[in-house]
Regions:
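Nucleic acid-binding interface residues in structured DNA/RNA-binding domains
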Residues: 7-18, 82, 87-190
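Low-complexity, small/basic-enriched stretches
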Residues: 1-88, 158-190
Length: 190
């Protein structure tokens, strides 16, 4: 287990029941990484090594409170579950982005995409100050270690097509559907 000045790094597997299992890594202060564990694939590349997706027991909403894990990990799991159940639009748990300057500019531009809306790769490139680097935006999105929180699922192709997503296009479509459904519900209530 890694140790640094912020404390021991912990990794848990959380089963959302909606988009499958997530591997969430953090310490006492912040979340550093969220990764999708996809079935039927038996493993996922995570932190430089291949880890089995089914070896560790997964926490769920029902047993998370009993878990002896960092409070920030519990908070992240709760907020992710609320988001997936259309009860939350933004995350408030602390995160740490780690990437190149360009990647971090792209991720910050993605953080500015409102819930329920999408932007094209070209629009994100412009927002990040590099209007011709729209292909590089796709590469930066692929290196996003905090999917869901940094909403790269809200970035689409120039013709409105769904393109690449670490969790798979089916998950990207599901996340966009969740957001559009909640947005429509809110509009109907107004």
């Amino acid at each position: 287990m890694q140790e640094n000045r912020e404390g021991r790094m912990e990794t848990i597997i959380y089963d959302t029941g909606i988009i499958g299992k997530l591997k969430i890594k953090g310490n006492q202060k912040e979340i550093r990484e969220i990764a999708f564990l996809r079935d039927p694939f038996p493993s996922v590349f995570f932190e430089g090594s291949v880890l089995p997706a089914v070896e560790e027991p997964a926490y769920t909403r029902n047993n998370l409170n009993c878990a002896e894990v960092a409070p920030v990990l519990k908070k992240a799991c709760r907020q992710i579950q609320e988001y997936l159940e259309e009860e939350r639009e933004e995350f408030t748990f602390p995160i740490r982005m780690e990437g190149t300057r360009f990647q971090e500019e792209v991720w910050c531009a993605m953080l500015d995409i409102p819930y329920g809306e999408t932007r094209t790769y070209r629009e994100i490139a412009e927002a990040a100050g590099s209007p011709k680097a729209w292909r590089a935006v796709g590469i930066a999105a692929n290196h996003n270690r905090l999917p869901l929180v940094i909403p790269c699922h809200r970035v689409i192709g120039s013709r409105g097509r769904l393109t690449g997503y670490n969790g798979g296009l089916d998950i990207k479509e599901k996340l966009l559907t969740i957001e559009s459904h909640r947005t429509m519900q809110k509009q109907l209530e107004e």
